[in-house]
């Protein structure tokens, strides 16, 4: 339970696949989620198809963000932030998207730089982990991009990289057919390997995977993603249609469609880190909420 009068913050996360709301407060040093909502919108799919967001999709995003902010206000949030991830960076009219969201919601709206997105995901994942060791790597596979961050509990993020390839983007490029042909599967693996070829992350004692792909994989193979586990999951997914994946594992159809692509990305990340990935409980929204709570606390002395 969160005490009456506790400071509350609302984070609206505008991603390639979904628009999500987190309303949270801090209780006994822990971040407590008071409300979470998710609306599938597919901004990244339209960006991949045409390079920009059309008027209809912009209007949909504005309406969903407005509803999320209205809900956050009803729940008594002291601060609400709208954060735009890859759609704001990858769409030709990303600035227009941010402007429309700002006008629709009346709250601060920011297009995150890749490094900012990665750092927030790192803070959110580490803060919600059970007794993390000193050095931790965090991988956040989004729809349009992937962030990989290594840092220390005492010092924060120290090594931050972003790859312009995510689960939705890879699906649109080479994995539209489900189940895929062997040619498509080979092409997907080649694209992933090429995207990560220059990444050599420092050693970490633990690694956390955040994002929708990791959460969905937990339903299939559990919370510990070893190389054999990820490879097995990829083989299973490559033999199924998205409808079958959704039915077999109780996963949303839209997530099932991009799950193989996300798994291939995580498999490459795990290979480069050299240690198992643990599915995290927090990510970018939790990191942003913690930052907002810290800033509010500092402002009030």
Indicate where each model-derived feature is located.
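Early-domain small/polar-rich strand-loop-helix modules and first-structured segments
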Residues: 1-38
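Helical "lid/coupling" subdomains associated with nucleotide-phosphate turnover
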Residues: 6-9, 23-26, 41, 46-75, ...
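A short acidic Gly-Thr/Ser loop motif
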Residues: 13-18, 139-145, 210-213, 283-284
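Extracellular/periplasmic ligand-binding regions of membrane signal-transduction receptors
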Residues: 80
């Amino acid at each position: 339970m969160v005490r009456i009068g506790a400071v509350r913050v609302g984070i609206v996360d505008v991603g390639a696949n979904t628009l999500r709301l987190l309303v949270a407060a801090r209780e006994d040093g822990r971040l407590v989620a008071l409300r979470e909502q998710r609306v599938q919108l597919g901004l990244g799919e339209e960006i991949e198809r045409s390079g920009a967001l059309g008027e209809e999709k912009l209007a949909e995003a504005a309406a969903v963000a407005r509803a999320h902010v209205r809900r956050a206000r009803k729940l008594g949030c002291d601060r609400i932030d709208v954060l735009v991830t890859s759609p704001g960076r990858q769409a030709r009219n990303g600035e227009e998207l941010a402007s429309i969201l700002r006008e629709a919601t009346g709250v601060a709206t920011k297009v995150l730089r890749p490094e900012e997105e990665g750092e927030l995901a790192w803070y959110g994942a580490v803060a919600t982990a059970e007794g993390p060791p000193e050095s931790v790597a965090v991988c956040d596979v989004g729809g349009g991009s992937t962030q990989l961050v290594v840092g220390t509990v005492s010092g924060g993020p120290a090594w931050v990289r972003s790859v312009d390839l995510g689960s939705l983007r890879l699906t649109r490029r080479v994995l539209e057919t489900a189940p895929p042909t062997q040619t498509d599967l080979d092409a997907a693996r080649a694209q992933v390997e090429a995207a990560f070829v220059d990444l050599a992350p420092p050693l970490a004692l633990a690694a956390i995977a955040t994002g929708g792909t990791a959460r969905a994989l937990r339903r299939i193979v559990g919370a510990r993603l070893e190389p054999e586990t990820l490879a097995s999951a990829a083989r299973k997914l490559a033999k199924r249609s998205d409808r079958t994946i959704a039915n077999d594992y109780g996963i949303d159809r839209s997530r099932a469609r991009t799950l193989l692509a996300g798994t291939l990305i995580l498999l490459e990340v795990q290979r480069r880190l050299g240690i198992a990935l643990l599915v995290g409980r927090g990510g970018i929204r939790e990191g942003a909420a913690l930052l907002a709570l810290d800033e509010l606390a500092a402002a009030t002395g």
